[in-house]
Amino acid sequence: MPVKIKIEHLTKIFGKRIKTALTMVEKGEPKNEILKKTGATVGVYDTNFEINEGEIFVIMGLSGSGKSTLLRLLNRLIEPTSGKIFIDNQDVATLNKEDLLQVRRKTMSMVFQNFGLFPHRTILENTEYGLEVQNVPKEERRKRAEKALDNANLLDFKDQYPKQLSGGMQQRVGLARALANDPEILLMDEAFSALDPLIRREMQDELLELQAKFQKTIIFVSHDLNEALRIGDRIAIMKDGKIMQIGTGEEILTNPANDYVKTFVEDVDRAKVITAENIMIPALTTNIDVDGPSVALKKMKTEEVSSLMAVDKKRQFRGVVTSEQAIAARKNNQPLKDVMTTDVGTVSKEMLVRDILPIIYDAPTPLAVVDDNGFLKGVLIRGSVLEALADIPDEDEVEEIEKEEENK
């Protein structure tokens, strides 16, 4: 994917003694000491990263980490102290007021935590507000607003007022209003934080559905790690105005960059994050369109296994061949496809470990990991699933758990 946003050495210091504060932060002095000695606050310091087009990029950190400041620097709601903000190779940090206004109106839209709806305007009028300030003709803006509301399943409520809607529905209106402008970039600041957990999850689902349809570039600020892991393609974790690590959820969980990140993610429920693709192992296969029983048995002996995944010439998954079945087929002069087990569990690469557990628990054979076209991508065994859930797994622990399950 092409790079949509590129940030170079972006810094924001609030206060008057900026040079002194910069010198102190360069020496590694903590944020609270800089504030105490200079009265200046380090918002963001020397930040560098790229965001790809069509990516959901989540910025997270504790309160005061600089995540919301960083978001507002992107559209210059907060002016940077130094650094560059490239959007499609144009440095937004150097734009004059008029050009910046056009970027805010046409390239970016923002969704806030507090909804930001006008109480005296109907839902439709709220949704078309951004188009109205752009002087879009009334008929066109109404059509675009209605389409955005329809995409958010809110068209039936277009003539109601914000106070008549629940918090979740009001936030959906805010999202519809942002999308009505057809922006290339969505900036979302703690957009779902004020919602109840169930409604928040529904909004996350809706955002992912809209993203699948429209493929916007989304920068999403959150303090909720589970939310970030659920919706983010990549995550940036901040502390004291600095980015500690950028990576996928899997990268951050399995390879934290430092002790701070390790502590930050240690309580996350790994079963809700890790997928089959992360823990599958290469599949040992036999091609049932080519291999006979003797070839299958030779492969099993070489690999020291008692079964093989059965695939056809196209490598589409067909079942499992055990050593007993292959021996019987050789004795009776049968092809493998006549004796193999076809009732074998399959999972997608994207399936979460928490959803895999009940499937693999009683499965008589390993699970096949397949793509949307049925092509075999790997295999899951019970041990690999258990290992994925362990904080610090070792082979002895996995074997012990497996024995306990077998004895139940």
UniProtKB/Swiss-Prot annotation:
Keywords, sorted A to Z: Amino-acid transport, ATP-binding, CBS domain, Nucleotide-binding, Repeat, Translocase, Transport
Domain CBS per the UniProt entry, residue ranges: 280-336, 340-397
Binding site residues for ATP: G61, L62, S63, G64, S65, G66, K67, S68
A GO molecular-function annotation: ATP hydrolysis activity
Signal sequence, start to end: none
Gene3D superfamilies on file: CBS-domain, P-loop containing nucleotide triphosphate hydrolases
GO BP terms, alphabetized: amino acid transport; glycine betaine transport
GO cellular component, one term: membrane
Reactions this protein catalyses: a quaternary ammonium(out) + ATP + H2O = a quaternary ammonium(in) + ADP + phosphate + H(+)
EC number per UniProt: 7.6.2.9
Residues covered by the ABC transporter domain: 5-265
Pfam families the UniProt entry points to: ABC_tran, CBS
Role played: Involved in a multicomponent binding-protein-dependent transport system for glycine betaine. Probably responsible for energy coupling to the transport system.
Family classification: Belongs to the ABC transporter superfamily.
UniProt protein name: Glycine betaine transport ATP-binding protein OpuAA
Organism of provenance: Lactococcus lactis subsp. lactis (strain IL1403)
Name of the gene: opuAA
